[in-house]
Curated annotation (Swiss-Prot):
GO terms for cellular component: nucleus; transcription regulator complex. Its main location: nucleus. Residues 11-21, 39-58 have a biased composition (Basic and acidic residues). Pfam families: PC4 (PF02229). The keyword rRNA-binding does not apply. GO terms for molecular function: DNA binding; transcription coactivator activity. InterPro entries: PC4_C (IPR003173), ssDNA-bd_transcriptional_reg (IPR009044), Sub1/Tcp4-like (IPR045125). GO terms for biological process: positive regulation of transcription initiation by RNA polymerase II; RNA polymerase II promoter clearance. This is Putative RNA polymerase II transcriptional coactivator. Keywords: Activator, DNA-binding, Nucleus, Transcription, Transcription regulation. Residues 1-61 are annotated as: Disordered. It comes from Caenorhabditis elegans.
Length: 124
């Protein structure tokens, strides 16, 4: 009987070793996945730092004009607009959110504003 119990012990040890190997492999895969995700986040942050531009929730580039004021180019109902908007920091999420203070200019309005810039500059 001792030989059968020792073979059972060996079998149990073998099964336990295999389970540990599987757990180790699973943990390795999980840690590799976490590491890959961290690298992707770092890469995205680096790209943002290199370009010096933020992006809004729709993926549009945000050009900083001043303190929490940004210009973006976006499409709405098939037309492109230049949006100049003031942002605020949300208390709960600590994310930058657009405020109601802002203006959207069509391409024609944007072109008019650009043409008026020399005259406006003379007033300063």
């Amino acid at each position: 009987m001792s030989s059968s119990s020792s073979s059972e012990d060996e079998l149990e040890k073998k099964v336990t070793k295999e389970q540990k190997k599987k757990e180790t492999k699973s943990k390795k895969r999980q840690s590799e996945a976490v590491e890959e995700e961290k690298q992707e986040v770092k890469k995205a942050k680096n790209e943002e730092e290199v370009s010096g531009r933020l992006k809004d929730s729709d993926g549009n580039e945000m050009f900083e004009i001043g303190n929490l004021r940004y210009a973006t180019v976006s499409k709405f109902k098939g037309k492109e607009y230049v949006n100049i908007r003031e942002y605020y920091i949300d208390r709960d999420s600590q994310k930058m959110m657009p405020s109601r203070k802002g203006i959207s200019l069509s391409k024609a309005q944007w072109a008019n504003l650009k043409d008026l810039i020399p005259e406006i500059d003379k007033k300063f």
